[in-house]
């Protein structure tokens, strides 16, 4: 196989997926002591040994990795055997678990965090602490764009300045060449509206102005001296950053929030403010109702903080 073919094959698979599958194969071979190619009996015993220890979704991911390995190597896929499917069904029956969901971030909490960040930005500016001013200005833009667009963490990390068209006072046009929901890799453009308050567009303008960035990743690391990294956020850096923000703003249970809290919170706000399911799915980019309902069900439609005056669906869509 030529290097150019390998290059394109590597690009066809998301890095996170590749790493998780490699870890799953390593667990099967090294930690459990399995052999590849595997038999249906071996896969069943592997599942049975970890059925009460690992989350069901983790087991499904391990099975998917084993299936891919066999398919790529040209061997029969043992994970499709009826016995494997029955063992999985038995594990789900005997070890039921409620899926842990990130807490939805609500409008009142967004306001609380933004107020905190604005105060910290002002203090940093007055004390001429450029690194701190940079960091908090970046965080404000990340928070507001992430919430009002219902972006996942990986979408925030993929945003590139050259793919964003800024119209001051009106909005942003953000093109993502690829995302988790874009199976055909056709790319998609997302509109981000300018708002009267908690404005993501103004926050983005402020971030570009203070950072001086004109290309590359929108959101990057900043060291203690105020040097901005050339690379975007690492895959594991976003959740700790958000939790530090939530803790700094005084939110309780900060560890229960994650990058999914932005999308979950937006879905709850939109539902409480009269968006129908079709409008919400089109805006966020969900392709199936099941995916959307996982976010909507987590919201409390009677929560007062969701019912604060805010932009209408027509304003955002």
Predicted feature descriptions by range:
Residues 17, 45-51, 57-262, 269-317:
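Conserved catalytic core of the tyrosine transesterase superfamily
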Residues 29-54:
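General structural concept
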Residues 13-38, 68-75:
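Basic/aromatic-enriched alpha-helical hairpins
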Residues 1-2, 10-11, 26, 93-95, ...:
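Short hydrophobic/aromatic segments of transmembrane alpha-helices and their interfaces
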Residues 1-22, 46-55:
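Short, aromatic/basic-rich helix-turn unit that serves as a nucleic-acid recognition element
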């Amino acid at each position: 196989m030529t290097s150019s073919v390998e290059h394109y094959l590597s690009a066809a698979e998301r890095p996170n997926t590749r790493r998780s599958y490699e870890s799953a194969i390593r667990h099967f071979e090294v930690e459990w002591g399995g052999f590849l190619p595997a038999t249906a009996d071996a896969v069943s015993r592997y599942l049975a040994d970890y059925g009460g220890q690992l989350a069901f979704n983790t087991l499904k991911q391990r099975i998917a990795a084993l299936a891919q390995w066999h398919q790529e190597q040209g061997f029969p896929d043992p994970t499709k055997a009826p016995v494997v499917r029955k063992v999985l069904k038995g594990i789900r029956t005997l070890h039921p678990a409620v899926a842990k969901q990130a807490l939805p971030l609500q409008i009142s909490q967004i306001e609380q965090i933004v107020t905190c960040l604005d105060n910290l930005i002002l203090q940093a500016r007055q004390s001429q602490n450029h690194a701190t001013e940079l960091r908090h200005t970046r965080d404000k833009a990340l928070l507001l764009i992430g919430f009002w667009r219902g972006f996942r963490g990986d979408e925030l990390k993929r945003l590139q300045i050259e793919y964003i068209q800024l119209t001051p006072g009106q909005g942003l046009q953000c093109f993502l060449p690829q995302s988790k929901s874009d199976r055909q890799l056709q790319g998609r453009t997302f509109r981000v509206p300018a708002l009267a308050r908690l404005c993501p567009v103004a926050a983005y303008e402020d971030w570009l102005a203070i950072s001086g960035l004109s290309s590359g990743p929108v959101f990057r690391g900043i060291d203690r001296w105020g040097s901005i990294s050339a690379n975007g956020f690492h895959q594991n850096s976003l959740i700790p950053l958000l939790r530090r923000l939530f803790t700094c703003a005084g939110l309780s249970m900060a560890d229960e929030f994650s990058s999914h809290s932005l999308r979950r919170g937006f879905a709850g706000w939109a539902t409480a403010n009269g968006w129908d399911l079709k409008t919400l799915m089109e805006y966020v980019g969900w392709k199936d109702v099941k995916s959307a309902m996982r976010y909507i069900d987590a919201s409390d439609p009677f929560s007062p903080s969701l019912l604060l005056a805010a932009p209408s669906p027509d304003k955002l869509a």
